[in-house]
Each structure stands twice: as structure tokens, then as C-alpha cells.
Amino acid sequence: MKVAKLHFTLVLFLAVTATTKAQEIPRSCDLEFPPGTGTRANVVTDATGNRITYLGGGIVARCIGQGNKLTADSAQQYESERRLFLVGNVHYTEPRATVTSRTMTYYQNDDHLHAEGDVVAVQSNGSTLRGPTADYYRSTPQRPLTRMFAPGRPTVTLVQKDTSGRGRPPDTAHVVANTITMEGDSLVYASGQVQITRPDLLATGDSAFMDSGHDFARLMREPSVQGKGTRAFTLTGGVIDVYSRNRQVERVVATPKGHALSKDLELVADSIDLRMQSNQLQRAIAWGVGRAHAISPDREIIADSIDAIMPGQRVREVRALRNAYAESNPDSGVVSSQRDWMSGDTIVAHFDSLVGTDTSSKPRIREIVAEGNARSFYQMKNSKGPQTEPTVNYVRGRIIDIIFENAKVATVTVTDKATGVLIEPAAASTGEKPGAVPTKTKPPATVKPPAVVRPPVVPL
């Protein structure tokens, strides 16, 4: 091996080594080292003529005509491989991004750099990646979008600028995952224990895709979305899509195996669509072949689809559509192992959603209406006997309307084709055993759900 120790200005060094290379691969990066930087060079040539140049004393390098810049404490240039290895306080800058690290390798042939050690990459829009290592691929005619690939569980801070024209400061979203890939200024792909933190929600999953240009995010593989604030909620499912506008989440859709849980309502269905405003749930829609369930501690509603209206995240109305069934605990004055129930083509439940002095209380049922082949079984306190022996009322009709007062049945109105039966226990003074309440009170499943159930048509 032939070793030549040369101490000269880099202008002369470039004149000797770079001119022929510039003609061989004209479309890739041709490095230049500006004069006047005090850089020292040591050139080593092996038996095959391959040259390795050791640079020290601080170096500055550029790709001719490409608007980028590399600085470091020292570097090694491998001419045959067209590769530059930089060590110590490495900085890479270009109009689209800046990258800093402890060490960096720049590959001239494909305009690609590999950074290691305390990597910080900042895009032109302010989004920042931090991690142990990263690969940055510059934009080229063959690769229009820049690309950043970072393993080793990096953290990305996405800057979400205000587009509403109100002059609000930008919000940020933090993404942590085992591997993150960024394309351009708006696309982010994350995989492996993904966590996304926004001012209004926390989202997790094993993989995620985010498109800030279209205010869209998708989470996959056991995803979960948790709303923040005083009235939080949680949504899980097979795949969760998040739609936003002006940095505010508007819709969160989970399918299949949707499960939504809030303070006032729990929903279980194949698909669940949550509508939001001001970081609070306003509406929840559930549907699917497997039937939709709306559950609370004292009530459950089942139907092909369910639409819950809940302004300010307090339930005001629940609509159960097609083959609807609802059951609830009996009145507070009744002790029974059976629950009251109601069925019909549709069931609409109205709640008192006004916020009182006790903001922790749940909305009380105010009215429930079943329409179309309606049936109802409910139990009332028996004035002649103990609480364990209630009066039983079973009615049928086209429409059944039940009004509640203080969570107790006040009136029952049956419209068209009204039939029914009232069963009261025998008086305690007769000594006879009170009449038994039929043990089977649930209506037979005479109507099977259709093979395919379409979601309800609701305004967006």
C-alpha cells in the first residue's frame, strides 16, 4: 500500500480528485470542500488505486449545485464507494430538513445519509424526530418525496399548524413506536407498540398511519383511542380511523369488534362511529350483523343499529332501529330477580340530560317508546304485599309509551291493537301463597336478524 501524507488547501485537493468523478455519475452528489476552513487532509492509496482521504480540523462539504451542507469535526472519504463518513458534532442541512448526530455516513450515489447517536431530524414544517439512529433519503427525480426511516423506538413530534385563520399557535402530536417512517411533510408510518398523544386524545396500537395533509389517522392491531378531559371515553376495535378538521377530532370509527365506553353509556357492535365537538362526544352510532348493544348499569338496549344523541357527552336520546329490545332494572320499590323489558320494531328512549348541581350523576330515563309490534313487561310495587311480590303488567300494541317520574313508571299508554294482562299477588290476609310470576318473561326470538345489516343513514 502506498501512503502519501499531504498538507495542502482543499482547493488543490479537489482539482486533483473530483473532476473525473463528476463526469462519471453526473446525476448523483459530487462533493466539494470549500477553501478557507483550515481542514487537514491525509490521502491513502492502496495497491488497486483506491484512495481513502482522512480529513481533520473541522470539515465542511457540499454536493455541488444541490443546496445541502455537511459539517463535522472529522471525516473519511472513500472515493471508490463514493461514501463520506463523518465523526463528531455532525450537522446536515438542506431546505427540507436538518439532521444532527454523533456520526453520519453520506452515500453519494443515492443521496442518502445514515445517522447514529443522539439523532435529531427537523423538517421544514417544524416536525422533529429524535432517536438512536435514522436514515434520510433526499428528494430526487426518481424519488419525489423525502423519506426518513428510524428504528430503535424513536419519538416524533408532529407540528399541526392552525388552518382556521384564527391565528392560534400550532398544536403538537407526539408519536412513539419501535419503528417510524416519514414521507414528505405529512405522511407517517409507525409500527410496534405505537403511542400517539394529542391534546385531545391518547391513541395506541401495534401499527398506525397518519396523513396530516388530510387530517386522517388509522390505527391497527388491537388499537385503542382514549378521549381526554373531564368526561373521558375509550374506543377499541379491529381498526380505528380518526378524522380531524382544524386540529380538532370530529369522528372516530372502529370496525370490526367496536367497543365504546363513556361515563353515561357503553356501546358494543361490529362498527361504532363516534362524533365529537370541542373534545366531547356528541353522538354515537353503532351497527353490524352481530347486533348493537347499548349498556348502562340499570338498562340495556339491543337492535340492528343504535343511534345515541349525547350533546356535551350526556345522553339525551337513544334510538334503537330494527328488531329492538330493551330491558332494565325494576322500579326502586320492587325487589325481583327479573328485569323489565320492552320490544318493538323501533325503540326510542329519552333521558333527562340537563346538568344539575350534581354533575357526577347519570341522566335519568324520562320516557321510552316502542313502535311496531310493541310488547312490554314491567313490574310495579304491590301496595298489598312485600317488595318481593310485585304487580306484573304485560301489554301488547302497535305503540307503547311509558313515562317515568323519579326513575319509576308513572303512566303506560298503548295505542292500537291494545291487549294485556295485570297480575297481582293475593292479599296477605287470605294466607294463600301469592301468585308466582312467570319465570320466562323474555319474548321468543321469532325474528332472526337479516344476514346483512346496513348502517343507519345519518347526517354527517
Segments from the language model and where they lie:
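Bacterial N-terminal signal peptides
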Residues: 7-17
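Positively charged n-region of N-terminal signal peptides that target proteins for export
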Residues: 1-6
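N-terminal amphipathic/hydrophobic interface segments
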Residues: 22-460
